[in-house]
């Protein structure tokens, strides 16, 4: 049952994140892209899979390529800009009345 309501995610493109569960636990990386519909993100250097490509006109020899696969955002936490540890985030208004994200542990504004 699809909903028209837009989902609010704690992860955005360009964020530094830490993996909290799975094979890549405790590894960190930068978010390359986010799929809001499926709640997945592609993180640099995380969840590497091996793809076997058939020879085509563009790639005459084919070959084996390692690339990042999407990972569910529930397995990711934002890295605190101050300490580098995993932290939850909150939202608050800054001096100009604009909503900003901040790290709950240190109070540091994210991005």
From Swiss-Prot:
<protein>
    <recommendedName>
        <fullName>Large ribosomal subunit protein uL24</fullName>
    </recommendedName>
</protein>
<keyword id="KW-0687">Ribonucleoprotein</keyword>
<dbReference type="GO" id="GO:1990904">
    <property type="term" value="C:ribonucleoprotein complex"/>
</dbReference>
<dbReference type="InterPro" id="IPR014722">
    <property type="entry name" value="Rib_uL2_dom2"/>
</dbReference>
<keyword id="KW-0699">rRNA-binding</keyword>
<dbReference type="GO" id="GO:0003735">
    <property type="term" value="F:structural constituent of ribosome"/>
</dbReference>
<comment type="function">
    <text>One of the proteins that surrounds the polypeptide exit tunnel on the outside of the subunit.</text>
</comment>
<dbReference type="GO" id="GO:0005840">
    <property type="term" value="C:ribosome"/>
</dbReference>
<comment type="function">
    <text>One of two assembly initiator proteins, it binds directly to the 5'-end of the 23S rRNA, where it nucleates assembly of the 50S subunit.</text>
</comment>
<dbReference type="InterPro" id="IPR005824">
    <property type="entry name" value="KOW"/>
</dbReference>
<dbReference type="Pfam" id="PF00467">
    <property type="entry name" value="KOW"/>
</dbReference>
<dbReference type="InterPro" id="IPR041988">
    <property type="entry name" value="Ribosomal_uL24_KOW"/>
</dbReference>
<comment type="similarity">
    <text>Belongs to the universal ribosomal protein uL24 family.</text>
</comment>
<dbReference type="InterPro" id="IPR003256">
    <property type="entry name" value="Ribosomal_uL24"/>
</dbReference>
<dbReference type="Pfam" id="PF17136">
    <property type="entry name" value="ribosomal_L24"/>
</dbReference>
<comment type="subunit">
    <text>Part of the 50S ribosomal subunit.</text>
</comment>
<keyword id="KW-0694">RNA-binding</keyword>
<dbReference type="GO" id="GO:0019843">
    <property type="term" value="F:rRNA binding"/>
</dbReference>
<keyword id="KW-0689">Ribosomal protein</keyword>
<dbReference type="InterPro" id="IPR008991">
    <property type="entry name" value="Translation_prot_SH3-like_sf"/>
</dbReference>
<dbReference type="GO" id="GO:0006412">
    <property type="term" value="P:translation"/>
</dbReference>
